[in-house]
Design a protein with these regions (language model features):
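C-terminal subdomain of alpha/beta-hydrolase-fold enzymes, centered on the catalytic histidine
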Residues: 415
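A glycine-rich phosphate-binding loop feature that marks nucleotide/adenosyl-phosphate handling sites
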Residues: 460-464
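C-terminal helical cap and adjacent loop that interface with cofactors, partners, or active-site loops
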Residues: 418
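Formylglycine-dependent sulfatase
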Residues: 2-6, 10-15, 19-412, 421-442, ...
């Protein structure tokens, strides 16, 4: 009898220790917006867009000032985040509307194997087809109706990993929603690459309205975690996949397309109230989540865990080596003959943005007259802002803005951010920047070779031959792919 009691006691102690061990690993909540740029959040300086919940995560945790997506397009950006790899390493997954290559490990699967309860609400990886590779559910996790329903399914001794993929602020918008919500047209600051008209200002407010709705959803999830006593043991991350859906934003490699909001909160390990200036990529999130869960990041991950930055207690530049970031794009939409892409690779530092356009003879926003279409399926989403550029592109004050959005670009672009924060004056051919351009060119070459980018080995045409997934979910050769499809 005594032996039985001792065995039972040991078993109970073991279960308790196992429960504590599981509880000691953080829950992981990723909240990702759909087409939101860095500068349009309160904690990042926007005085009009109301984002109290993003701001809370930033103020109670760490706000990253220089976070960038791997590619300014939904599918490759999300694939890079999930795998912790640069988008150009993902084969088909480097393009929008692609097939998911199941050979690539994703952090939700790795955490599930390590005992995490994993779930997804909303937009995960995509748009594209993950079933052809043999997956039963989205690479971001099994789908749930909402976060509250998911929490009810989490076993008491298991940590969870949840991906909340909002579809805000993706277009189309309800016109006038921003004004109806209480914003005033006069409050808006229009970027200098867009016409400053009433229609554009209202369009920006409609975009703000959807960011605010995303922020409210984040707030509801934080509230649920507080009510269940799980908030402080949850690593909360709020970010976006790519920039805002306006001309010279989404699908471009300028800051409006690539610079992302990123706030991370985890009180037991992260000292709050800090702003970090280190350059980080969304590819860094997967290795960060794995390391926080006590797992070793995979060797093939090109992203680097930001956990050392988070736990350093420091603000400003924490690691001197994190002084640059790399990104780019391939095919975003079916807007060119043969459905070819517009390949770019880029390096961004605190002082400069250097872009290499591999096919400068192609039209960056689509072949004429296709680029001018005002629907929601193109390289530049249809909008009142796009209309303002297209319909008035022959007017003296809009011609330059039209060129920024639609004209062909040279093989190299270089922007001096100290003089030109909006990246509107290309200085690549100016002699005083010759040394700088050569240095950035060499650094980009080195990184592309190091990460086995097909563009560095002369095999870049492969990106144009990958399958293009149509609206019915069927993968078809690029030549057969129709232009119109469901909302990306």
């Amino acid at each position: 009898m005594k032996i039985r009691k001792i065995l039972c006691l040991l078993l109970l102690c073991g279960l308790a220790l196992a429960g504590r061990a599981a509880d000691s690993r953080p829950n992981i909540l990723l909240c990702i917006a759909d087409d939101a740029s860095w500068r349009h959040f309160g904690a990042n300086g926007d005085k009009v867009c109301r984002t109290p919940n993003f701001d809370r995560v930033a103020w109670e945790g760490v706000n990253f000032r220089h976070a960038f997506c791997s590619s300014p397009s939904c599918t490759p950006s999300r694939g890079a985040l999930l795998t912790g790899q640069d988008f150009w390493r993902l084969e088909d997954g480097a393009n929008l509307w692609s097939r998911w290559p199941n050979k690539f490990a994703v952090y939700p699967d790795l955490l599930a194997k390590a005992g995490y309860h994993v779930g997804l609400k909303g937009k995960g990886w995509g748009p594209g087809d993950f079933k052809q590779g043999g997956r039963e559910h989205n690479p971001a996790g099994p789908a749930y109706k909402d976060f509250a329903m998911f929490l009810k399914t989490v076993p008491p001794v298991k940590p969870f990993c949840f991906w909340f993929g909002s579809q805000d602020p993706h277009r189309p918008y309800e016109r006038g929603a921003g004004v109806k919500s209480g914003h005033r047209i006069e409050e808006v600051t229009v970027p200098p690459f867009l016409p400053d008209t009433k229609a554009v200002r209202s369009d920006i407010l409609d975009y703000y309205f959807e960011i605010e709705r995303f922020d409210r959803d984040v707030g509801e999830m934080l509230k649920l975690l507080e009510q269940t006593g799980q908030l402080d043991n949850t690593l909360v991350v709020v970010t976006s996949d790519n920039g805002f859906p306006f001309p010279r934003g989404k699908a471009t490699c300028y800051d409006a397309g690539t610079r992302m909001p990123l706030a991370i909160r985890w009180p037991p390990r992260i000292k709050g109230g800090r702003v970090v200036d280190d350059f980080v990529s969304l590819t860094d999130l997967a290795p960060t989540f794995l390391e926080a869960a006590g797992l070793r990041p995979l060797p093939e991950m090109t992203g680097r865990s930001v956990l050392p930055l988070l736990t350093s207690g420091k603000s400003g530049q924490v690691e001197a080596a994190r002084d640059k970031v790399f990104f780019g794009r391939e095919r975003h939409a079916n807007v060119r003959a043969g459905n070819v892409g517009y390949p770019i690779r880029a390096i961004r530092t605190s002082q400069f943005l250097y872009l290499r356009n591999f096919e400068p003879n192609r039209w960056p926003a689509g072949d004429p007259p296709l680029y001018g279409d005002v629907d929601e399926h193109l390289s530049i989403d249809g909008s009142p802002s796009k209309q303002a550029v297209v319909e008035h592109g022959d007017k003296a004050d809009v011609k330059r803005l039209f060129a920024f959005a639609f004209a062909k670009r040279p093989a190299e672009e270089l922007y001096d951010l100290g003089q030109d924060p909006w990246q509107m004056t290309n200085v690549a051919t100016e002699s005083r920047y010759t040394e700088t351009k050569a240095k950035l060119h060499a650094e980009l070459d080195r990184y592309m070779i190091e990460t086995k980018d097909q563009r560095a080995s002369g095999k870049g045409a492969e990106f144009d031959r990958y399958y293009y997934v149509t609206g019915d979910g069927a993968g078809k050769p690029v030549e057969a792919a129709p232009r119109n499809r469901a909302k990306p």
